[in-house]
Amino acid sequence: YHDQFADVLRLYFNRLDNILGQLVASMETIPVSIGGTNTDAFGRLRVSNPLTLFDSSHRYADNTLWVNSITGTAAATFNANEGLVDLTVGSASGDQIIRETIKVFSYQPGKSLLVMNTFIFGTAKANLRQRAGYYGAANGIYFEREGSINYMVERSSVTGSVVNTRVAQADWNQDPMDGTGPSGLTLDSSKAQILYMDIEWLGLGTVRTGFIINGAFVPCHNFNHANLINTTYITTASLPLRYEMTNAAATTGASTLKQVCSTVISEGGYELRGAQLSAGTPITTPKTLTTAGTFYPVVSLRLKTTRLDAIAILTAVSILGITNNANYKWEVVASGTTTGGTWVSAGTNSGVEYNITGTAFTVGTGRILATGFFQGSNQGSNSVDILKEALFTTQLERDPFTPTAYELTLACTAASNGDQVLGSVDWEEISR
């Protein structure tokens, strides 16, 4: 057996020597560079799973994720055939429509924030200004066409006043998209476009902007700041999405901007690391559900009117039936209306106020985000992790134009008159 085993080994090594002899080795190094849009805003290779903070499309209706500011004859109209919203203005000077999300999206330091907007701008004409991007009234980044000229714009309020730094297409520092740039492409902003930007904030980083054409990211202009400026370039990178169209003066006929889809993505995931707060009914003062089948507010939350761009997320609810063997139903409702009671600040550094003494509640046009049943007992409260898989579903919302903070309410009803409950809610404030 030893001889046979030795023969096998000799045969194996002879074949190995033959294979190795056919290989050509080179000691020269081959430089490999992976950059450009293959990496995120912090230079990390784009291999991580993106976490979607927000997405918007319009399949069956103008969804409830946006609010409008309308001046003159402007309007927002759902277009069922095209699956989008038509934003229109007339020809009169001052006609304007602005569409903004009811939520502000959380930038997490050290994570690249990728934003995409799709749209079709209306025909270029004198005095007509059209915009789309990641911005609000005071800060942000957006693409603009005024008349027939395209711009990338950085809006900042770090000086105490709003300053719009516009960079005309001819001056874009990556690709002017006039046929002479690296891509060889010519931008037609009256055609369907996918605008993208990735944001490396940390107060001082770079914002890369461009378009996605033929399935490829085409960088157009970078707003660079590190080693160049003396302060932050915008007040915050936690911002809403916007579309807008304005007649700066009279125009020749009506105009239409088609709003299609939007998304905000945190590249590399997202971890909640905010301040944790809670509010609830006092142990000695349970909520009495006077009329069976009627929902009453147990705890209501809303943003302070002075902090409508704050980011606060409901994370858990706890509710306990005081009346043994009584049957209850609870709901978490966005944009309902609490009547009566007193709104109390959750703290000097908090952007939230709460109401635990409301006397009546109306769902109205609000949305029921979660619901459940429980029975009164002496076995402890029912705790519900309200986050589940949708991290920002229970984020507090607002209308920046009115301005109004929308409520988020834990409401409860019982099967019998006069049953009582105790309840509390937990939330996390990211912006602080």
PLM segments and residue spans:
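Extracellular "spike/adhesin" assembly and maturation modules
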Residues: Y1-I30
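Ligand-recognition surfaces built from glycine- and aromatic
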Residues: S33-V47, A226-G293
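Extracellular glycan-recognition surfaces and repeat-rich motifs
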Residues: A61-E82
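Secretory/extracellular carbohydrate-interaction modules
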Residues: L87-T165, R302-T305, G321-K329, S335-V344
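Beta-rich globular "head" domains
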Residues: Y107-F121, S266-A414, L422-S431
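C-terminal interaction-tip segments
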Residues: K125-S148, A216-P219, T404-A405, C412-R432
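Glycine-aromatic-enriched beta-strand/loop faces of beta-sandwich-type recognition domains
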Residues: R129-A192, R367-G380
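Localized edge beta-strand/strand-to-loop motifs within extracellular or lumenal beta-rich domains
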Residues: S190-T206, I212
